[in-house]
Amino acid sequence: MPAIPPFNLQRWIAQNRSLLKPPVGNKLLFEDSGFIIMAVGGPNSRKDYHHDPSEEFFFQIEGNMVLKTVQDGRLVDVPINAGEMYLLPAQVPHSPQRPAGSVGLVVERRRGPEEFDGFSWYCENCGHQLHMERVAVGNIETQLPEIFSRFYSSLAQRTCSVCGTVMQAPA
């Protein structure tokens, strides 16, 4: 990868804010790197939980966010405020919730060909896992909408087998 000169991230955000749109609102900052480095803006409308085979680094630049996680079978909210950073351990299911006007930086390690990311959904009434899909992520910007579309178009996958609650697509 050729050397890329330093750039002002705040200026980049100001000039590219329109790219940080729902449902995920992320924009890859560097191509051909060993890391996936993304600017991510709110609001987002995610109900999925991501399972990353390696750690994820979060740095909240503007506004606050809540990282919903599943830890030891319990749903746990991790608030990350402007100026704060957080290192999420590998394989912890997580769902970033970003309000309007928020912007963060997320860094992940590129996956090897043998590694798969997971995306799961949990019943909003009882917490039971509704569905899990594992995929080899090549292009997160194009693959996430496809994964979400498959889940939300399936009534069977959105219906809880424990309590019968049906998850609706995010607004």
Q: What annotation goes with each model-predicted range?
A:
Residues 1-59, 64-85, 93-171:
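Jelly-roll (double-stranded beta-helix
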